[in-house]
Every structure is written in C-alpha cells, then in structure tokens.
A protein has these predicted regions:
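A preference for well-ordered globular domain cores
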Residues: 1-188
Length: 188
C-alpha cells in the first residue's frame, strides 16, 4: 500500500498499484511495483505501514476509520486506528427504534444453532405424538441435553458483565482447545 504526500499531508492512498498523475506527469499502475522506494519517494509516493494495535474484533467493537499520517522520522506513512468503541450489550430504543444489543444477537445465534441441531430429529417427536410409538431414549436424552446446553449458554451470555467478558466466552484456549461457552452435545 502506498500514499501520496504533499507538504507532509497524505492526499491520496493507493491500496494496490494503480495509474496516477502528479502535476502534468502520468504514471502507469506498475510504477509502484517496478520503481525503487527511493524513486517513489522522490515523487512523494511513500510506503504505508499499517498499525493495527487499536483495531478490535468488529463482532464486538466499532472501530474508527484508518487515519493516515506522514511520519517524517521513518519516511513512511503510518496507518493507524483510533480507540475502538464497545458495542452495546443490551437492547437500546431511541425515538421508537430498537437496536439489538450483543446479548440479544448472541442468544439468538445460540437459539438458531440449537434449532439446527434439533430440527433433523423433530420427526421422531411428531411420530411419537401421532402414533403413540415410543421414541428411543437415546434420542430423548440427547435432545434434552441440547436444550439444556442452549439454556446454559444463554445464561452465560446474560451473565457477561461487559463486551470483553462476552468475547472471552468464545475464545478457544488450552489443549485440547475449549472455550468457556462450551459446545453443544454430539449425538452418538
């Protein structure tokens, strides 16, 4: 990535090589790939160095736009993020418009996963109800364990004190890899 700098101010960013003009001079797209760094710097085209230190997981945070600043000390353009803002944990209504918070969104995902696991065996429940034939106890036990795990996961989500605590529920660690939220049971 490169940037055009004029009087120590970034005037244009090139995410990939592309044709450009400076004054009356036109340059083909391959200029950025073929020319040396010194030759590019001579026409005020500088390498961009990305710093993602402040960038946070966009699932849980609202990141700022990238800020491009010419750094005369390094002779590069720094691409940095401002301080990320945590998304709302709880639902918020402003002027009659509801915006779902992270807890609602994540609990719905868990509900959808639970539904996806149970749906293929729903016919067994229907058959039992319609015909009176008993469902295999292994299926009953597994279905109950899926619902129990769903409720447990949602309780953990509700119990998360802040965005970082919620994000931590999904982080896999250790060997074997596990996460605090856990996993749904598998039908054997």
């Amino acid at each position: 990535m490169w940037a055009q700098v004029d009087n120590n101010t970034v005037t244009k960013v090139f995410p990939r090589p592309q044709a450009f003009s400076i004054g009356d001079n036109n340059y083909p797209a391959n200029t950025m790939s073929v020319w040396s760094e010194a030759n590019l710097n001579a026409i005020d085209i500088w390498e961009v160095v990305e710093d993602n230190t402040n960038f946070k997981d966009s699932e849980f945070y609202i990141n700022t736009n990238v800020i491009y600043t010419y750094n005369s000390g390094t002779g590069k353009v720094d691409a940095t993020y401002g301080t990320a803002t945590a998304k709302e944990m709880d639902d918020v209504t402003v002027d009659g418009i509801l915006t779902e918070g992270l807890k609602t969104i994540h609990k719905r995902r868990i509900d959808n996963q639970c539904n996806g696991l149970l749906a293929p065996s729903d016919w067994r429940v229907t058959k039992q109800e319609e015909t009176g034939s008993a469902m295999d106890s292994g299926w009953k036990t597994w279905r109950a364990s899926v619902r129990t795990k769903c409720n447990s996961m949602q309780a953990q989500i509700d119990g998360a004190a802040d965005v970082d605590a919620l994000a931590a529920l999904y982080e896999y660690t250790g060997d074997p890899r596990t996460r605090p939220l856990g996993e749904f049971p598998v039908k054997e």
